[in-house]
């Protein structure tokens, strides 16, 4: 949320100084009116895509403001990951998503959202679900109220969205869709 003071607009990516101290949050009458945040997505590009299963069964659709990563489990396994970045998390301790929707309709399938490197090696798992032999049934949406504490010791990360749909011949999916990711 931006904040306007003395006709000056202070964006979320800036700082407010009070008594020579840089604030990450600013309250007025005990109400939060400004909070420093960094937009990760939209903004950072798709740095790398890895198709790890049967090629036609993995798709990525990136509109710049909405990304969809989809694995289809047909006669072969659909599996792949997308690395968005790089971005620096130094100075931030939490991460939240603006409407990240993850769902699985297939058995032997997984979804994962992680922080890691350009090669897909994760450093910190944020979201993970494995259906095992159970047929799907996973459907969760994460919003701005779902905060994830991050380890910013490294500071230079990629956001990894990974989907894996088992070869069950059922033609079912594992999907991650996201509209935004922010550091606070």
Regions picked out by a protein language model, each given a short descriptive name:
Residues 1-37:
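Intrinsically disordered, compositionally biased repeat/linker segments
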Residues 34-59, 63:
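Extracellular carbohydrate-recognition regions
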Residues 66-91, 141-148, 173-178:
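Short beta-strands within extracellular/lumenal beta-sheet-rich domains
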Residues 87-98, 154-158:
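Extended extracellular/luminal ectodomain segments enriched in beta-structured repeat modules
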Residues 106-111, 172-176:
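Short coil-to-beta strand junction motifs in C2/discoidin
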Residues 122-153:
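Extracellular carbohydrate recognition and processing domains
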Residues 161-170:
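Short beta-strand-plus-loop segments that form exposed binding edges in beta-rich domains
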């Amino acid at each position: 949320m931006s904040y306007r003071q003395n006709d000056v607009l202070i964006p979320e990516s800036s700082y407010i100084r009070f008594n020579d101290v840089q604030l990450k949050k600013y309250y007025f009458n005990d109400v939060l009116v400004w909070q420093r945040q960094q937009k990760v997505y939209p903004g950072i590009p798709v740095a790398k895509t890895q198709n790890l299963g049967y090629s036609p069964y993995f798709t990525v659709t990136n509109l710049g403001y909405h990304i969809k990563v989809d694995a289809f489990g047909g006669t072969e396994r659909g599996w792949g990951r997308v690395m968005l970045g790089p971005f620096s998390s130094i100075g931030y301790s939490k991460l939240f998503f603006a409407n990240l929707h993850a769902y699985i309709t297939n058995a032997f399938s997984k979804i994962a959202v992680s922080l890691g490197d350009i090669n897909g090696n994760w450093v910190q798992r944020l979201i993970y679900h494995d259906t095992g032999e159970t047929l799907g049934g996973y459907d969760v949406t994460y919003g701005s109220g779902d905060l994830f504490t991050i380890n910013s010791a490294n500071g230079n990360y990629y956001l990894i969205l990974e989907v894996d749909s088992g070869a069950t011949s059922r033609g079912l999916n594992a999907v991650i869709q996201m509209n935004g990711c922010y550091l606070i």
